[in-house]
Amino acid sequence: MNFSESERLQQLSNEYILGGVNSPSRSYKAVGGGAPVVMKEGHGAYLYDVDGNKFIDYLQAYGPIITGHAHPHITKAIQEQAAKGVLFGTPTELEIEFSKKLRDAIPSLEKIRFVNSGTEAVMTTIRVARAYTKRNKIIKFAGSYHGHSDLVLVAAGSGPSQLGSPDSAGVPESVAREVITVPFNDINAYKEAIEFWGDEIAAVLVEPIVGNFGMVMPQPGFLEEVNEISHNNGTLVIYDEVITAFRFHYGAAQDLLGVIPDLTAFGKIVGGGLPIGGYGGRQDIMEQVAPLGPAYQAGTMAGNPLSMKAGIALLEVLEQDGVYEKLDSLGQQLEEGLLKLIEKHNITATINRIYGSLTLYFTDEKVTHYDQVEHSDGEAFGKFFKLMLNQGINLAPSKFEAWFLTTEHTEEDIKQTLKAADYAFSQMK
């Protein structure tokens, strides 16, 4: 494929935009470098770049675009609302309608607040939990990404009794000292942290199904034990469902798994492609938030009519019969095809799939923990990524990310993807 115009525009972008991208994950640093492809438009399962190349898209903006690009029902809703006004700074009926649809789908959201990103949503749930418990420390799990606020950019200490350290320049040590990081799926490490820190722990922050070091399921009983141990300690359980809400079924992962948290943060999919975030949970906890309580959270753009309208339209598409069955079927076809090719070409790789989302790891073991992904073969992934890109298959440029299917992918797309993977694997020996 010819990428000359993308390369030219990336050079121009470097003159004006820091690093040439507005989010570091969009660079190709993690796959060996090179100029990122500059996209021009998207329709359904496909993206088109500035050089006229067409791609089957499995990046899907890192997850939000579950109904494909420019879905006609959502596009129409956005256009209609834009003609009426995009921001009023007042309550609207759309906020009420959208909140009701969300609570109908996710019953634990007894009360809801909208913000503008997943980062904001998680950041605020932590503040609310601290206000409710009158404690300061939180526990998070290694490898889970919860946005870029100071509160969660914290790396693990040497063990559950050790405080975290900043995972980014600019994060104060004083903030990191309020965070304990333990391995996901390691209930003994979690018990040890709770036993050591006791009544200092306000909340534990959990991805119920991990989506930030690929797709990883909790081990049987893990979430149930986290809930029990936490509540016995007076610690709140916060689920970060920014990736997982409406990803696997019409609702949240918590309902699919049958384990209910105290608070939930959501975003990505629910905005229909527009900026959105939100949080909600038990009424008595949510009443800590202003104007009813002392925990302050506000936002000029929060609950804006454009995002509310897009979110309503998105849920109207997803609540139709057969949507998630199709995603699961396509995901199964893709997984089975890739596994056959891995065996055919004797590639050291494994796959985790959860319905219409999967991750291909270049490692020889089933992935259940972050360390396994960190030690997987990043060089092999980078080579595979570029071989696929040059055949018109757009993946996330990182070994830690998932492939996302949409309602608009087809069986023919899967066949083309597997044909491309067959060639890519053949070049990796």
From Swiss-Prot:
CDD domains membership: OAT_like (cd00610)
Gene3D superfamilies: Aspartate Aminotransferase, domain 1, Type I PLP-dependent aspartate aminotransferase-like (Major domain)
Reaction catalyzed: (S)-4-amino-5-oxopentanoate = 5-aminolevulinate
InterPro entries, sorted: 4pyrrol_synth_GluAld_NH2Trfase (IPR004639), Aminotrans_3 (IPR005814), Aminotrans_3_PPA_site (IPR049704), PyrdxlP-dep_Trfase (IPR015424), PyrdxlP-dep_Trfase_major (IPR015421), PyrdxlP-dep_Trfase_small (IPR015422)
Pathway of action: Porphyrin-containing compound metabolism; protoporphyrin-IX biosynthesis; 5-aminolevulinate from L-glutamyl-tRNA(Glu): step 2/2
GO molecular function terms listed in the Swiss-Prot or TrEMBL record: glutamate-1-semialdehyde 2,1-aminomutase activity; pyridoxal phosphate binding; transaminase activity
This protein's record includes keyword Isomerase: yes
Cofactor names: pyridoxal 5'-phosphate
A GO BP entry: protoporphyrinogen IX biosynthetic process
Pfam families: Aminotran_3
Domain of life of the native organism: Bacteria
Enzyme Commission no: 5.4.3.8
Subcellular location, record wording: Cytoplasm
CC annotations in GO: cytoplasm
Keywords: Cytoplasm, Isomerase, Porphyrin biosynthesis, Pyridoxal phosphate
Subunit record text: Homodimer.
Family: Belongs to the class-III pyridoxal-phosphate-dependent aminotransferase family. HemL subfamily.
NCBIfam families: hemL, PRK00062.1, PRK12389.1
HAMAP family per the UniProt record, alphabetical: HemL_aminotrans_3 (MF_00375)
Protein name as annotated: Glutamate-1-semialdehyde 2,1-aminomutase 2
Organism, as annotated: Staphylococcus aureus (strain NCTC 8325 / PS 47)
